[in-house]
A protein has these predicted regions:
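Repeated scaffold domains used in trafficking and secretory/extracellular systems
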Residues: 60-73, 114-131, 171-182, 214-226, ...
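N-terminal low-complexity, Pro/Thr/Ser-rich intrinsically disordered segments
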Residues: 30-68, 72
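C-terminal motif of bacterial Sec signal peptides marking the signal peptidase cleavage site
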Residues: 15-17
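Surface-exposed loop/turn elements that mediate protein-protein interactions on large endomembrane-trafficking
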Residues: 45-61, 87-115, 147-167, 192-214, ...
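PLP-dependent class I/II
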Residues: 32, 91-92, 397
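Short beta-strand elements that form the blades of beta-propeller/WD-repeat-like
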Residues: 68-86, 127-145, 178-192, 225-250, ...
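Positively charged n-region of N-terminal signal peptides that target proteins for export
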Residues: 1-9
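Bacterial signal peptide processing site
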Residues: 19-22
Length: 438
């Protein structure tokens, strides 16, 4: 489910941004015909469509830095943790922000957490996710495969696991469930190249499935409120059914990306803007801005450069956040906010990670373009950067640090920070007492 894309920054850029005393300001706005917002005349004049089902607050189903499923309620973090590196067994853990403790999500006295009698025990965590709805925790099949569970289970720490919904036959095999709201889970399997697709809505609480048609080459890349943000390729001529690579390249040379809002309840789309197909690498949507890489120069040379741009939906202009980024030096992934997306609350910082160094973490300020290094903490006598993981309802940041010499996804130490101290290279406000298997 990881859909990250690379953005490249140099060491000099990092040093300049991190040492800057005053935040850098974005470059002046520029408007391009290909980046213009849709005018009212371009929108459909048809009567409003009737919603076919309720849509709540859409979220991308979150993962942590290791690709493991997590869920942040603002008061606690729920996650699946491998019980052993030798077996597929896993445990559902809860990190309580107020109590500063991580524990197995089980309240049965004397439970050894090693069988299905334990509410938190999973014989296998392959293709399993965790979510919380209305204060209740569930596990669900993250991808519909032969090794995935066939049920959604309600987890009661006092009594055990209860199956509440079976995977319906109407959902296609191997589809990933990537988004959710208060009512349903959503998935959109990959369609054949240049062919229409289908978005599936599984209302697991009422045992129904709805389908929403997707346009050719259309993909969901983000969500806000009750709408999905989509991107699709639009060309001046149809793609041949069995065209050669050269034919396709010739068509794509004059194609554009179309960004639009999709209302899943009605199927209606609202066009936002278009960008040249050559400008790719969508990175994030934040505060009415679509961030992507563009303005490629010196293509296919060691000196190739690009810019980090954003389209501002508030005024219909494209702006440059970072310019002159050499593409052969530093790789930084800025596709998603540090997971699990602050329980759905937007933040101005992106978690970024330098290529080739699992411990080098930074933040990108999406308002100023500053790149800030993660502060280092001493955990068990070892200095490691504090990797951002979640945000609490009280506004503190939860971080993870791994003091092991070799990267061990089963082992991390959590801490809570005041954001100002984190950004000032300070120290955490408190450490979390982690669960340790007996």
């Amino acid at each position: 489910m990881n859909r990250t894309l690379p953005l490249i920054l140099t060491a000099a850029l990092l040093l300049t941004a991190c040492a800057s005393a005053a935040p850098a300001q974005p470059n002046a706005a520029a408007t391009y015909p290909s980046a213009a917002a849709s005018s009212p005349q371009q929108q459909s004049a048809a009567s409003p469509l009737t919603p076919k089902f309720p849509v709540g607050h859409l979220l991308t189903l979150p993962q942590n830095q290791n690709g493991s499923p997590v869920w942040n309620t603002g008061d606690a973090l729920y996650e699946l943790r491998d019980a052993s590196s030798m077996t597929p067994e896993a445990l559902l853990l809860k990190t309580d922000y107020a109590a500063l403790t991580q524990s197995v999500y089980c309240g049965i006295p004397g439970c050894t957490h090693d069988s299905d009698a334990c509410p938190a025990y999973l014989a296998s965590d392959f293709c399993v996710g965790v979510m919380a709805v209305d204060g209740t925790v569930y596990t669900y099949p993250g991808e519909l495969t032969n090794v995935a569970p066939t049920q959604i289970y309600r987890i009661d720490p006092a009594t055990g696991k209860t199956p509440v919904a079976a995977v319906p036959d109407a959902l296609p095999h191997h589809m990933q469930l990537q988004w959710c709201d208060e009512y349903a889970l959503y998935g959109c399997p990959l369609a054949a190249s240049h062919q229409p697709g289908t978005l599936y809505r599984w209302d697991w609480q009422n045992d129904t499935v709805q389908t929403i048609p997707m346009l050719a080459d259309e993909k969901i890349i983000a969500c806000e409120g009750s709408r999905f943000l989509t991107i699709r390729i639009e060309a001046n001529e149809p793609f041949p059914n069995f065209g050669s690579t050269e034919q396709e390249k010739a068509i794509l040379a004059h194609a554009v990306y179309v960004y639009a809002w999709l209302d899943p309840a009605t199927g209606a789309r609202e066009k936002i803007c278009t960008r040249p197909y050559a400008d790719g690498y969508f990175h994030n949507y934040y505060d009415g801005r679509i961030y992507y890489t563009g303005n490629f120069r010196n293509a296919d040379t060691p000196g190739q450069q690009a810019s980090l741009l954003y389209f501002d939906t508030a005024d219909g202009t494209e702006k440059t956040l970072l310019d002159g980024i050499p593409l052969d030096t530093y790789g930084i992934d800025v596709c998603v906010p540090f997971s699990p997306a602050f329980a759905g609350v937007p933040q101005r910082y992106l978690r970024v990670q330098t290529a080739g160094d699992a411990y080098a973490d930074c933040l990108l300020d999406m308002e100023t373009g500053d790149v800030l290094p993660a502060p280092a903490v001493t955990a068990e006598g070892v200095r490691r950067p504090a990797l951002l993981l979640a945000c609490t309802a009280a506004g503190q940041w939860l971080t993870a640090a791994n003091p092991r010499d070799s990267y061990d996804p089963q082992y991390s130490l959590y801490a809570l920070w005041d954001p100002a101290d984190f950004l000032a290279d300070g120290q955490p406000a408190a450490w979390v007492t982690m669960y340790a298997a007996e």
